C-alpha cells in the first residue's frame, strides 16, 4: 500500500483546526444559575421586568442559563388594615377592627397551604443534591425570611467556590440572620433616596470591569438603600457609592451602592440598583449586571480585596456635605482640605470612624457638636 505525506498547506489547515478545537474545549460553557425572585415581604413590581432581562443577559452573552425559583401562583390576598375616618364612632371603629381581626385569622388558614407549597419548593431547590448542579445563585429583589431549609449549609455552599449575586432588595432579605447579612454585605435600614429622585453617584475604581461602564461621577434615577450597623467595611470592596454632596437628602454617613467580595472560595457581587423598571431596561445597567455576574462566576479577573480606607474617605465626604449644609459652611473648601489630608495619609479618615459613626445615632438637631468636632479635625494643622 502506498502512502503520501501531507503537504505543508494541509498540515497548516490541520494544525489550525486542532488549535480551534482545543480553544473551544478550553472555553467554559454557560454557567447554571438559580435565580430566586420569591418575596415574603414587600414585592417590587420591577421583578416582572428583571426576570426576562436576566434570562436574556445570560442567553445572549452565552454566560449563564437561568433556572428560576418564582412565587407559586394562587396565594390568597391578605386583608388590608382599616384606617379610621374622622367621623367614625367608637362603636363603628371597634366593629371594623373586629372584622379585620377575623379576616386576618381566615387569611392565615387560607394561606397555610400556599406557605407549605413554598417551603416544599425551597426544600427541593436548596437540597444539597440540587445545589450541586448550580454554579451560583441570584437573589433578584428577594425580601423577607425566605424558607431556605438549611441556611448555614447554603452559606457553606457559597464558600465552597460558588457565586452569589444580589440585586437591589437582596439586602432586605433574611435580615434576622447575621450570617446572611455578613455574606451579602449589608442589611436594609431605609431608603431616604427614593425611586422617583435622581441621585448623584461616584465610581471609586473607574477601571474595575464591574463599574467601568459608568462615568466617574453621574446621576441615576433609582431607589437607594442605607444599611444598618452590621455593615462591615473591612469585608467589602466598594466600587460605587452615593455622592452625598450631589444628592438629597444629605445625610452624614457613607452609602455604598455596589461592591464585590471574596467569601471563602466563593465570590459575592451586590448592587443596590434595580428598584425601577427603567433601570433593568437600561443598556448601561445591563452591562453592570452582566459584568458583576461574570466576575462572581470567575469568568473575569478583577480585584476584590476590601477597601475600608476608600470607604472611610467617602464617609468623611458625606459628613462634610451634611455639616456644610447644616451650618452654612463652604462645602467645597472643607472637602478640599479633607481630601488633601486623605491624600497625605489615607488612614487618617479611617481613624475618625468612631466619631463619624456616632453621628448615625443622632437626630439632625443633635448633630451640631459632633459636626464641630469633625470640622476641627479637618482644620487641625500638622497632618
Each predicted region: which residue ranges?
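Structural recognition of the beta-strand scaffold that forms the well-ordered cores
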Residues: 34-36, 66-68, 135-140, 163-168, ...
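Extracellular ligand-binding/catalytic regions of CAZymes and related secreted enzymes
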Residues: 25-31, 37, 45-48, 52-61, ...
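Bacterial N-terminal signal peptides
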Residues: 9-19
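Sec/Tat signal peptide C-region and signal peptidase I cleavage site
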Residues: 21-23
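Solvent-exposed loop/turn segments at secondary-structure junctions
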Residues: 39-43, 72-75, 142-146, 164, ...
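A glycine-rich, often tryptophan-bearing local segment used as a flexible ligand/cofactor-contacting loop or short
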Residues: 130, 136-139, 143-216
Amino acid at each position: 500500500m502506498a502512502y503520501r505525506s501531507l503537504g505543508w498547506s494541509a498540515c497548516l489547515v490541520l494544525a489550525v483546526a486542532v488549535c480551534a478545537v482545543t480553544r473551544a474545549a478550553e472555553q467554559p460553557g454557560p454557567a447554571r444559575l438559580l435565580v430566586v425572585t420569591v418575596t415574603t415581604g414587600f414585592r417590587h413590581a420591577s421583578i416582572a421586568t428583571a426576570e426576562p432581562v436576566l434570562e436574556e443577559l445570560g442567553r445572549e452573552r452565552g454566560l449563564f442559563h437561568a433556572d428560576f425559583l418564582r412565587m407559586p401562583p394562587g396565594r390568597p390576598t391578605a386583608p388590608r388594615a382599616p384606617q379610621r375616618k374622622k367621623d367614625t364612632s367608637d362603636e363603628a371603629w371597634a366593629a371594623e377592627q373586629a372584622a379585620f381581626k377575623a379576616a386576618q385569622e381566615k387569611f392565615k388558614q387560607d394561606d397555610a397551604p400556599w406557605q407549605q407549597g413554598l417551603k416544599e419548593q425551597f426544600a427541593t431547590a436548596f437540597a444539597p443534591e440540587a445545589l450541586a448542579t448550580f454554579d451560583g445563585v441570584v437573589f433578584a429583589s428577594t425580601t423577607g425570611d425566605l424558607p431556605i431549609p438549611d441556611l448555614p449549609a447554603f452559606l457553606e455552599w457559597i464558600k465552597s467556590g460558588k457565586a452569589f449575586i444580589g440585586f437591589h432588595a437582596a439586602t432586605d432579605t433574611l435580615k434576622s440572620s447575621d450570617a446572611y447579612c455578613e455574606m451579602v454585605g449589608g442589611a436594609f435600614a431605609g431608603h431616604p433616596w427614593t425611586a422617583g429622585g435622581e441621585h448623584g453617584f461616584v465610581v471609586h475604581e473607574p477601571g474595575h470591569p464591574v463599574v467601568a461602564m459608568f462615568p466617574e461621577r453621574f446621576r441615576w434615577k433609582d431607589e437607594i438603600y442605607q444599611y444598618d450597623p452590621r455593615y462591615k467595611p473591612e469585608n467589602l470592596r466598594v466600587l460605587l457609592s452615593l455622592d452625598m454632596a450631589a444628592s438629597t437628602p444629605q445625610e452624614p454617613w457613607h452609602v455604598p451602592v455596589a461592591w464585590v467580595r471574596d467569601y471563602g472560595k466563593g465570590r459575592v457581587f451586590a448592587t443596590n440598583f434595580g428598584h425601577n423598571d427603567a433601570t433593568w431596561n437600561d443598556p448601561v445597567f445591563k452591562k453592570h449586571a452582566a459584568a458583576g455576574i461574570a466576575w462572581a462566576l470567575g469568568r473575569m479577573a478583577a480585584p476584590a480585596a476590601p477597601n475600608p480606607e476608600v470607604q472611610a474617605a467617602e464617609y468623611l465626604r458625606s459628613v462634610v456635605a451634611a455639616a456644610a449644609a447644616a451650618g452654612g459652611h463652604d462645602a467645597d473648601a472643607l472637602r478640599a482640605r479633607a481630601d488633601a489630608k486623605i491624600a497625605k495619609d489615607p488612614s487618617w479618615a479611617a481613624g475618625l470612624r468612631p466619631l463619624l459613626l456616632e453621628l448615625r445615632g443622632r437626630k439632625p438637631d443633635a448633630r451640631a457638636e459632633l459636626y464641630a468636632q469633625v470640622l476641627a479635625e479637618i482644620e487641625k494643622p500638622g497632618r
